[in-house]
């Protein structure tokens, strides 16, 4: 066995959407400016290619308009004329919403990697932290010590992660070592039969399904993404020291031991798979409890029940997951986990976040997307370890 294989474990992870998934790439398109509706398709305009196709008379009129009208008005007129001549170049996305798409509507653009490795690693990280909390006897103390209500709302639980995962660097270096830095997740290495679609993502009240908010987004609706997940083990160096350096050496050794203990645990595919399975299946249970008996969501309830039946037994190499935008606190943070250990602290965090974010508490809403005239939760997918 090579030296490298002793300290490195790598395996392939395949991700498939079960319902449309959206990971925002940070860009928006505006209908009539850099995107057009053409029949049942959205065209994300490639201006470089479109300008190459544009006839000289149209370009002259566009240039004249730019001198006398606002740029967005001139652009809209220019594109309208090119559209009528079928001269628009760009990525064409099927429109899968019945909602009217008005001029100047904004569309959130899917990330260029669809679901980047950083998004998948963030989900895995949250699952591991929840798994570790379930295994340690002093979880209540870690939660009590780790919550900081003085921090920005989204960061109130970072202290819990620090207590579980961080070790101080040797005193002269300062700072901390995050034990989960041993995990790396590549961006997708293969894209298989990928389908994108434009859909309306909705936030509704859990009890009445009343509208709270909505937006248009390009989603990943079908296909397979392949990633490489790598777990590194750090070789414990042979350290010799003078007596006055012994404390520093012990700090280094303790830090490496903590990191490698975690690496040994995570490096077991069974442990990682079972941890992510528990995480995903808990998410299914939480959502089923929210929607149980809601007539309009019966097909969604059936879908989750099938996922639970197919993927929540320990003899499968695939697990359910919920990833991306509008998937709720449960899938992105450890805050909902606090309720299981200390309801009082959970209520304090809930109150703090509601005050700062000025919106309905996450657990009181559902995030839905229309698929073939039915409503389903956004972001459900299947993760398989090969």
What do these predicted ranges mean?
Residues 1-386:
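Basic, Gly/Ser/Thr-rich N-terminal segments that form RNA-phosphate-binding interfaces in CRISPR RAMP
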């Amino acid at each position: 066995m090579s030296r490298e294989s002793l300290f490195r474990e790598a395996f392939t992870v395949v991700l498939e959407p079960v319902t449309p998934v959206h990971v925002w790439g940070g860009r928006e398109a505006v209908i009539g400016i850099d995107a057009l509706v053409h029949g049942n398709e959205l065209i994300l305009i490639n201006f470089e290619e479109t300008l190459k196709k544009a006839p000289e008379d149209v370009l002259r009129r566009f240039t004249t308009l730019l001198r006398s009208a606002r740029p967005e008005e001139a652009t809209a007129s220019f594109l309208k004329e090119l559209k009528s001549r079928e001269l628009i170049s760009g990525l064409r996305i099927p429109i899968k919403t019945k909602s009217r798409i008005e001029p100047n509507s904004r569309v959130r653009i899917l990330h260029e990697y669809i679901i980047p490795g950083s998004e998948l690693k963030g989900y895995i990280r949250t699952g591991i932290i929840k798994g570790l909390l379930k295994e340690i006897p002093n979880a209540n103390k870690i939660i009590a010590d780790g919550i900081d209500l003085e921090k920005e709302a989204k960061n109130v639980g970072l202290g819990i992660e620090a207590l579980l995962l961080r070790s101080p660097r040797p005193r002269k270096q300062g700072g901390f070592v995050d034990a989960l830095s041993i995990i790396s997740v590549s961006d997708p290495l293969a894209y298989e039969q990928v389908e994108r679609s434009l859909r309306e993502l909705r936030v509704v009240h859990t009890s009445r399904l009343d509208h709270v908010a909505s937006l248009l987004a390009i989603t990943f609706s079908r296909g397979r993404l392949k990633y490489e997940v790598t777990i590194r083990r750090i070789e414990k160096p042979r350290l010799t020291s003078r007596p006055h350096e012994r404390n520093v050496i012990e700090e280094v050794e303790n830090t490496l031991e903590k990191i490698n203990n975690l690496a040994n645990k995570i490096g077991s595919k069974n442990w990682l798979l079972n941890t992510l399975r528990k995480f995903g299946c808990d998410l299914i249970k939480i959502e089923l409890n929210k929607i149980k008996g809601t007539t309009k969501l019966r097909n969604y309830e059936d879908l989750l029940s099938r996922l639970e039946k197919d993927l929540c037994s320990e003899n499968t190499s695939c697990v359910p997951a919920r990833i991306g935008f509008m998937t709720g606190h449960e899938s992105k943070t450890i805050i909902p986990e606090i309720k299981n250990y200390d309801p009082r602290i959970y209520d304090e965090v809930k109150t703090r976040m509601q005050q700062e974010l000025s919106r309905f508490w996450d657990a009181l809403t559902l995030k839905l997307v229309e698929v073939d005239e039915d409503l389903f939760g956004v972001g459900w997918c299947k993760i398989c370890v090969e």
